[in-house]
Amino acid sequence: MIKSLKGDLEMIWLVAWRELRDQLRDWRIIFPMVFLTVILPFLADLGAKAAINFTTKYGTPLIAERLVPFLLMVVGFFPVTVSLVIALESFVGEKERGTIEPLLSSPLEDRQLFLGKLLAGTAAPLFTSYLGIIVYLIGLHLQNIPFPDANRMAQTLILTTLQAILMVSGAILISTQATSVRASNLMASFIVIPMALLIQGESIMLFWGNDQILWLAVIGVTILAALLSRVGIAHFQREALLGREIDVLNVRWILQTFWRSFKGEAKSVFGWFRFEIFKTVKKQRRVILITVVIGLLAMIAAYIWMSMNIKDVISVFREENLSALPTGVDSPLAEGISFPLIWGHNLQAIVIILLLGLFSFGVLGALIYLLNMGVIGAIFPLIGAIGKPPLKMGLFGMLPHGIFEIPALILASAAILYLGIALVTPRSQRTLGEVLIEAIADWMKIGLGLVLPLLTIAAAIETWVTPVLLSWAIK
């Protein structure tokens, strides 16, 4: 086993060194990366100094204190985006230059080719990113600006490394699917824009000063980087690289593929409900079970956390605000409740789970699901803190519609997790596009056949039944 691993690493390094050697001999690649990497940290140092002077003058040094690690993150991020062009042309660039045939005809395995390109593609962005961080820190030292604490430094360096791997994995995946360098460069926006949004979220956490959530971001980015690398390895096919000359947007084929998977073998609407939906549920039963288990764990963890920190939570609110919380059907909150409002709100949550899950292999969709389940667990100690019986309120205020709403949430979340699993599973007879379309069709089966009816029933009960039961229970 060790011998096999050593052989794999040697082959991966062989591909990586070939790629790095080509990069290092081209001054048109090296000069812009190094020049921009040195200039940006210099400007960031000047900005940090000006911000510190300005905020100190008006008595708000906390802003400057949080700005220094924020600029450190920015300095680490931008060189990666500049160097991303190397990864974007890793396969398709060689195809246009006519140098890919010898590489693909070698006895190297597909995963060795992909991982070798990934290693070489990550090296340049990380080198320029670390170089920019070093220049930035030297500038801080020369201007007598305090360094960020060790925890923030570690978080920034880890996030920079993981984000580089995540972006390069996506770029190489694009390079294996694109038919030209021009197309791969245009598709780079699907990497840069989401990563820029991620950086904005991390920046909010930095200015907020919550280190625990930043470590959760580290875990999340690690999972996404691993999944995206896995997708690249799972769907890398050297034969497709040689055979694909141009891709035309075939809307008819997309619709036919979707409809064939969505309809299945059903001959009627009744047959579709009777056979296809439950066939899909059976196919996803393990994922559904996992979703139920992690949802229960989220509820228990939230309940324990809220029970242990209930005094701190209550101290945030004034006593009169807690006592004024609406609890009955005659409250202003209850008066605004309507069937369309509740149904639309629940549907919105399901759509958000779908959209976030599509861009994160189900990870962000599962996170929204866990947050919803966590809220259910956390609300019981809070109900007790305001002097209401938690068990009675839960039995009459949540259970009537919850027995329909929670299964709908579980099914929708499990379906989007299954989509992510389908994408990272190797399927030699299916292209990445076919796998994605079929997985979306499976989600739509669950969504239209089960989730939507369950949400409709839950909204009706929550509108007309739950308020009556809750009003009777609290009298």
Give the location of each predicted region:
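Selective transmembrane-helix segments that form parts of the transport pathway or gating/packing helices
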Residues: 78, 83, 108-139, 292, ...
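A structural motif at transmembrane helix-loop-helix junctions in multipass membrane proteins
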Residues: 24, 28-31, 90, 145-193, ...
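Hydrophobic alpha-helical transmembrane segments of multi-pass membrane transport/permease proteins
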Residues: 25-51, 70-83, 190-202, 291-301
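Transmembrane helix boundary and interhelical loop/hinge segments in multi-pass membrane proteins
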Residues: 84-104
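Aromatic- and glycine-rich beta-strand/loop motifs that create alpha-glucan
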Residues: 1-35, 245-246, 256-287
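Transmembrane helix segments
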Residues: 35, 42-50, 166-219, 223-226
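Membrane-interfacial helix-loop-helix connectors in multipass membrane proteins
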Residues: 50-67, 134-161, 206-209, 381-396, ...
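Interfacial/capping segments of alpha-helical transmembrane domains
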Residues: 48-58, 299, 303-327, 469-472
